[in-house]
Amino acid sequence: KYGFLKPKALDDSVDRILKHLDARTHIVLEFGRYGNMLDAYIFVANFLTRRLHQKYVEKKENAFGNKAAEPAPLVITIEEAHKFLDPQIAGHTIFGTIARELRKYNVTLFIVDQRPSQIAPEVMSQIGTRVTALLDEENDIRAVLMGVSGAAGLKEVLARLETRQQALI
């Protein structure tokens, strides 16, 4: 179905990615011609992050408090996050688990989306730091401010943002 899947591979490309991360090399996945195939996009991202989850949990637990043996901090950035974190999909991917649990394993989830209201509320509630630009939809504003103290005052600030301005919440 996908040209990138092979019945037999010469090496493990995920292991190569993990070695680059161990060497503190930044990795960017670009889906090229498969970028518009949502099922391929979710399959690859979910497969890769499940392996990352497994490796980081294992490395952190094997470190037994030895900071030098712990895995390097990792930030997983997901653009168009609603594709992975929408309420119907989030439960079937590893991203909800990462948002909830992996900070203690040196992994942070950084989500980017223009429609935060389409992201599962249980995931949004786990996001500690939020950066937002101007939002026009009331439900998107509500989603960004969910669980934030002083949300009423912040709502006014968000409504006054101009193009190219952001608010750190």
Predicted regions mapped to residue ranges:
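P-loop NTPase motor domains
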Residues: K1-T97, T163, A167-I169
